[in-house]
Amino acid sequence: MVVSEITVAVGAVIEDDSGRILLVKHVPERGGFWQGKWICPGGGLELGEKIEEGIKREVMEETQLEIELTSPLLPFERIVKQKGKTTLHVIYIDYLAKLTGGKLKTGSDVCQAIWVGKKDLPQIWEELHEDTRKLLKTAKVI
């Protein structure tokens, strides 16, 4: 598959009152680039949607949690090529966020969600998606 569009993915590195970070895994049926790895909650920004609104919507859809965005993180991008053709071009726009409400419950496209202590993140390093590793380093939580 060759893509002709750039995806803008928005999300959050969410911390609870105990200093733990929220990670999710997508359902197997969804497939795709992030399948089978732990990632931070997020997804595609919709046309006409403000970045902050998109982040809060995606977090609510995937986890049923309410958050407060505290500070933006440096955006980064990923370009995936197969046989010389671009199959994915995504620009990540993420924020640090604090949990403010709700009860953790996975949405329809998420099969697992866990809170992980910052000191425990190295233990699941290989289970983190490579872009999530970069994001967590940018957020200075690892």
Language model: regions and residue ranges:
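Short, well-ordered beta-strand micro-motif
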Residues: 14, 94-98, 114-117
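A generic structural micro-feature
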Residues: 2-6, 37, 85-91, 110
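Active-site segment of metal-dependent pyrophosphate-handling enzymes
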Residues: 64-101
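Conserved N-terminal beta-strand and adjoining loop/helix that marks the start
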Residues: 1-22, 96
